[in-house]
C-alpha cells in the first residue's frame, strides 16, 4: 500500500512486482558504484598535481574501459530481459476480464460469464464517506479472486488511455482499435488502487482504478449476486 510522504515503491502484491523491485535494487547498486567511481576519479583530478599530458596511448586502459562497460550492460540487460519475458507469459488463465477505456471512465466485462459487465466511475469528492480516498474511489470495484492467474484484455473506445495498478506492477496502454493483454496474480487480498496513466483529456485525473482481491469463495458469491 501507499503511505503519506512515501518516497519509494508501494508494497509488492504480485510476483512480477517483486521481481521489478529486485531489478530496481540491482540496477541502482550498479549505478551507485559507477557514480562513486566517477566522483572519486574527478576528485583525484582536482586535488592531485600529477598529470599525464605526454601520454599518447594506453592500450591496457582502453581495453579495460571497453570491456568493463560491456560487462556492466550485460549484467543489466539479462535480468531485464528475463522480467520482460515473464511479463508476457500467460499460461492457462483462470479468468479473463476485458477493460475498455472511455473519456473518462472504465468499463469491464467478465468474458467467462454470460452477462457480467459494468462501468466504473470516480466517486466525486462531495460524495465520499469517512475514510475513503479522494480521487481514487469508484462506484463499482473490479472484484477478482486472489492467487489465481487473471488475463486482462485492454482497449479503448476513443483516445489513448493506460490501465495501471502500481502495487501489482501493471501498466498497459489502452489503444483504440487494438487489444493489448497482460496478466496479474495477487498474493494477498485487499484493495489496490491505480489510475489512468496516459494523458487523455481534461478529466484524465479522474479515471481511478480499484481492484478488490478476495478469496475464491467470496468472488463466487459476488459473481452470483451480480448475475
UniProtKB/Swiss-Prot annotation:
Broad class of enzyme this protein falls into: translocase
Pfam families registered for this protein in UniProt: COX2 (PF00116), COX2_TM (PF02790)
Segments on the Mitochondrial matrix side according to the record's topology features: 46-59
Cofactor list: Cu cation
Subcellular location as annotated: Mitochondrion inner membrane
Main location: mitochondrion
Binding site for Mg(2+): 198
Family annotation (InterPro entries): CcO_II, CcO_II-like_C, CcO_II_C, Copper_CuA, Cupredoxin, Cyt_c_oxidase_su2, Cyt_c_oxidase_su2_TM_dom, Cyt_c_oxidase_su2_TM_sf
EC number: 7.1.1.9
Mitochondrial intermembrane side: 1-14, 88-227
GO cellular component: mitochondrial inner membrane; respiratory chain complex IV
GO BP annotations, alphabetical order: ATP synthesis coupled electron transport
Binding locations of Cu cation A2: 196, 198, 200, 204
Cofactor binding note from Swiss-Prot or TrEMBL: Binds a dinuclear copper A center per subunit.
Bilayer topology annotation: Multi-pass membrane protein
GO molecular function, one term: copper ion binding
Listed PANTHER family: CYTOCHROME C OXIDASE SUBUNIT 2 (PTHR22888:SF9), CYTOCHROME C OXIDASE, SUBUNIT II (PTHR22888)
Family statement: Belongs to the cytochrome c oxidase subunit 2 family.
Subunit organization: Component of the cytochrome c oxidase (complex IV, CIV), a multisubunit enzyme composed of 14 subunits. The complex is composed of a catalytic core of 3 subunits MT-CO1, MT-CO2 and MT-CO3, encoded in the mitochondrial DNA, and 11 supernumerary subunits COX4I, COX5A, COX5B, COX6A, COX6B, COX6C, COX7A, COX7B, COX7C, COX8 and NDUFA4, which are encoded in the nuclear genome.
Name assigned to this protein: Cytochrome c oxidase subunit 2
Species of provenance: Rhinoceros unicornis
Gene expressing this chain: MT-CO2
